[in-house]
Structure formats: structure tokens, C-alpha cells
Amino acid sequence: MAGIVLKYKIPQFQEYTIHVQKYNNVTNSSELRSKLAELPFAYIDSKTVISVEQLSSAIYKAILETEYNRMRTRTIHSECILSLSPSSNIGDALNRFGIKEGTTDIIVIKIIEDSNEEPYDGNASVDGDLVPVSDDEFSTSADKEIIKTVCIPCDKL
């Protein structure tokens, strides 16, 4: 599962196409953060993700919640961020896993429901270096201390 852009479908949800990109040396995270509600992507701080499996699990859960009308957020993309969190608090999930003002390594998720949207052209509005989506790349940017902090349920902090 390595490549510059990871593009795949989940077998039981063939109507969704998932695109995952990773950027390093991002210079416009403040601009992206100010437009989060307008842009049809999930922007995730790469320091909080250690593997493709972790990300794929969150994407799968977000699609499940969408398909069974159990979404707790407004979009499938924000549902991906919530699905990374051990907490069910949306604001807390966005603060822990979403991008911040100075975020320099970003993971971008774009989920397209094939019947409803135009094909994705790969433009995620990120000014940075596109790097391969792989466990090796995630492990270089992941901060294990931050991961320990964000993955502890809120009542344990």
C-alpha cells in the first residue's frame, strides 16, 4: 500500500473512492485551518498518525457511520477525524487530530461518493512537498509522545 497518493475502495463500499495524500514542509497550514469548513477534505496533523492501518480504520469507521446514518459530524471528512479519536467529543477530536497553526506535516483525506461528485483531481490546496503514503513515511513524522497523549481517553488525562 505505498505510493505518492494512496487511492483505494473498500470492498463492501464500492461506491466510495478514497484518496490519501501526505505533505511535508507545509507552509499554508494557517490558511487551510481558516478554511476548514469550506474545503471538502480531512486535514490531519501527521504527528498523530503512526500507520496506514490506523488511518484506514478511521476512514472505514467514517464510511460505516455515513452509510448507517449515524454520523455525529456534518461531513464524512470531519467524521474521519472524529473516528481517529478515543473520545466522542467532536471539538476535542478536531483539536487533537486536526491541523494547527504551525502544522508542517499534513495528511489529506478525500472521500468521493462516486455517484455524487466529480472525480478528484488531486488538488488539496496544500503548499508543501507531496511524499509517499506509507508506514515508513508516517513513522518518520509521527510523534509518539503526542500519540500517547491524544489516544488516552479524556477521562484519563
UniProtKB/Swiss-Prot annotation:
Q: Which GO terms describe its biological process?
A: tRNA threonylcarbamoyladenosine modification
User: Keyword Transcription regulation: yes or no?
Assistant: yes
- Please provide one cellular component term from the Gene Ontology annotations of this protein: EKC/KEOPS complex
Q: Which domain of life is it from?
A: Eukaryota
Per the record, the major location class is nucleus
InterPro entries, alphabetized:
CGI121/TPRKB, CGI121/TPRKB_sf
Q: Which Pfam families match?
A: CGI-121
Tell me the compartments it is located in: Nucleus; Chromosome, Telomere
Write the record's keywords in alphabetical order, separated by commas.
Activator, Chromosome, Nucleus, Telomere, Transcription, Transcription regulation, tRNA processing
Q: What does this protein do?
A: Component of the EKC/KEOPS complex that is required for the formation of a threonylcarbamoyl group on adenosine at position 37 (t(6)A37) in tRNAs that read codons beginning with adenine. The complex is probably involved in the transfer of the threonylcarbamoyl moiety of threonylcarbamoyl-AMP (TC-AMP) to the N6 group of A37. CGI121 acts as an allosteric effector that regulates the t(6)A activity of the complex. The EKC/KEOPS complex also promotes both telomere uncapping and telomere elongation. The complex is required for efficient recruitment of transcriptional coactivators.
Q: How does it assemble?
A: Component of the EKC/KEOPS complex composed of at least BUD32, CGI121, GON7, KAE1 and PCC1; the whole complex dimerizes.
The family annotation for this protein states: Belongs to the CGI121/TPRKB family.
> What's the protein called, per UniProt?
EKC/KEOPS complex subunit CGI121
